Amino acid sequence: MLAEWGACLLLAVALLGPGLQAQAMEGVKCGGVLSAPSGNFSSPNFPRLYPYNTECSWLIVVAEGSSVLLTFHAFDLEYHDTCSFDFLEIYNGASPDKGNLLGRFCGKVPPPPFTSSWHVMSVIFHSDKHVASHGFSAGYQKDVCGGVLTGLSGVLTSPEYPNNYPNSMECHWVIRAAGPAHVKLVFVDFQVEGNEECTYDYVAVLGGPGPTRGHHYCGSTRPPTLVSLGHELQVVFKSDFNIGGRGFKAYYFSGECQEVYMAMRGNFSSPQYPSSYPNNIRCHWTIRLPPGYQVKVFFLDLDLEEPNSLTKTCDFDHLAAFDGASEEAPLLGNWCGHHLPPPVTSSHNQLLLLLHTDRSTTRRGFSVAYIGVVPMNVSCSRTDFQILISTQALAPLERTKVYLGSRSCAAQEVGGNLRIQARFDTCGTESQRRNNTSVIVSVLYIDFSAAGREDIHEYEVRCEPRRKEASVHLLSGSHWLGPYAATAEHLQEAPPMDEAEALEGPVSMVAQDTSDIVFLGLCILAGILMVIAIVVLMLL
């Protein structure tokens, strides 16, 4: 245990090293590592005037698994509208990264209490060469029960989790997003004493100020994923005088760290992209399309911390894709480093991307584009195409919005499908030579345009008539990829047959037609017999 704390303190001193050297140069002793379970600290000379040109850094480190509650007893710094002169900055973690900044403060109004989302918090005090005030005095403690949480993401646990929580506890947390953003709360473990009305031990989640619109949860069934009505979510945990449980663990996400996308196509990126993403975040992006669709994601840029050099696995910062709306869905892929992954496609209408970062080393992050893919069955003969699309996938659309080559070749509704049957000499088909093979090609259009906004999806339909093999490929032109079009030109190339079959939905494969071979053989045989007959006649 002592060795672990020693290593932790060495790490803290290394992180604070540059700040401590700067303070020594100014001749002012301040800052340091605070590792006791609780304590107090203040600006230099407090309560007298603090010195000019001073910068102090405090790193508060408590036992792992705990959190830090920071409160202020006194506060008096030079005032400025943007706190550009003298100021106090509070960071959620060890790194003074903008993404971890909980707030910058000056003037005479004390900052509110702050709770870290893990066991480390940083405080930086800065004064310039003009105007000094009395400074500040603050206190901290570990293992807090409740508090105000303001980071992009973090973890929330019951007291002493995963051990049983104490009796007669009452904890209040306020999770507050910046600006107009919402807060998302996801429970990953839950075991609280239960009864039918949750009147003994419970977790209550309130969507706004006051005890209104609240939901109470108890027992061992995890609560559903909850999203705030506004920019704030309140969580209350209460236990009675007997019978406990393991408690709960939940992740919260806010702002650009949690989004739900429901448009047919779009782009998004990691927080602060293309600048470095913050440390210690866990972000969710959910793509949710109407039933019947699949989601295809293209990676336009990826720059994360490199894999573990020993295990060669993504043990540190990583981006994961799940085939559904939660982390319990099948994993489609897990990536780190800077090599672009291939596109991934969901099997149904939802896909989740998760970004996890640790306490050190940040990079540029990622940028992706996605599009809703319509599963379809395409087959062909030596003379025509047949395309079948389930009406469930295109329920909001009229059949005339689905057409091959031109609007005159619109789909017909047959049973539960939209069907297009088109000869190779109609509907904009053309013959091309690809990989020394003759193929017939046309373009299938699905028009989602509405309210004056054009949105037409294009699929290349391809047939090799001699083998009666058909395939379909998503055509993604650069017009929908925004500023990343130059990096996504490869999307316009059709994938090989097996990739198209795996990623673009079912493709009908028909056995090779041997009638042409038989016909050619008969012609050759007839020619040989004719030559033999002529020779015999000449000999006679």
From Swiss-Prot:
Residues 23-516 are extracellular. GO terms for cellular component: membrane. Coiled coil: none annotated. Glycans are attached at residues 40, 267, 377, 435-436. Keywords: Disulfide bond, Glycoprotein, Membrane, Repeat, Signal, Transmembrane, Transmembrane helix. Disulfide bonds join 30-56, 83-106, 145-171, 198-218, 257-283, 314-336. Residues 30-143, 145-255, 257-373 form the CUB domain. The gene is CDCP2. This is CUB domain-containing protein 2. The chain crosses the membrane at residues 517-537. PROSITE patterns: CUB. The lineage of its organism: Eukaryota, Metazoa, Chordata, Craniata, Vertebrata. It is a single-pass type I membrane protein. It comes from Homo sapiens. The keyword Transmembrane applies.
